[in-house]
């Protein structure tokens, strides 16, 4: 039996007020992703897919190779962390998606990126 790779994804987001211009409907957010390899063999991140939704329901899809110009190899028990950003036209939105990955045998699999919120702090009580 082939063991399914065990990968955990966690995301933290923040509002970047210094780069935002609310009067021009420009709300900038940074998010930090931590990808942990909980399995017993290497995994490599090959690509990404994001679905970004603003509070008006407008959706944008983003996909491409790797993340921040890398296709990291993550060893068992290790993690890879990176920070990136998103610009919305509204002060509230969500992101979700998946990573395209390969295991140590070259078998492709997807790791889900759970939905997370992008919001200016004054909107969340």
Swiss-Prot record:
InterPro entries: ApaG_domain (IPR007474), ApaG_sf (IPR036767), Uncharacterised_ApaG (IPR023065). GO terms for biological process: error-free translesion synthesis. Pfam families: DUF525 (PF04379). SUPFAM superfamilies: ApaG-like. Residues 1-125 form the ApaG domain. HAMAP family: ApaG. PANTHER family: F-BOX ONLY PROTEIN 3, POLYMERASE DELTA-INTERACTING PROTEIN 2. NCBIfam families: PRK05461.1. This is Protein ApaG. It comes from Yersinia enterocolitica serotype O:8 / biotype 1B (strain NCTC 13174 / 8081).
């Amino acid at each position: 039996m082939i063991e399914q790779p065990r990968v955990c994804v966690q995301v933290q987001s923040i509002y970047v007020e210094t780069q935002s211009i609310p009067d021009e409907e420009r709300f900038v957010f940074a998010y930090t992703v931590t990808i942990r390899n909980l399995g017993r063999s290497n995994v490599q991140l090959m690509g990404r897919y994001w679905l970004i939704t603003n509070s008006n329901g407008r959706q944008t899809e983003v996909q491409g190779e790797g993340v921040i110009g890398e296709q990291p190899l993550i060893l068992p028990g290790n993690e890879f962390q990176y920070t990136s950003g998103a610009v919305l036209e509204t002060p509230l939105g969500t992101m979700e998606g998946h990573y395209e990955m390969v295991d140590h045998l070259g078998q492709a699999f997807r790791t889900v990126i759970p939905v997370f919120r992008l919001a200016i702090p004054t909107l969340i009580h």
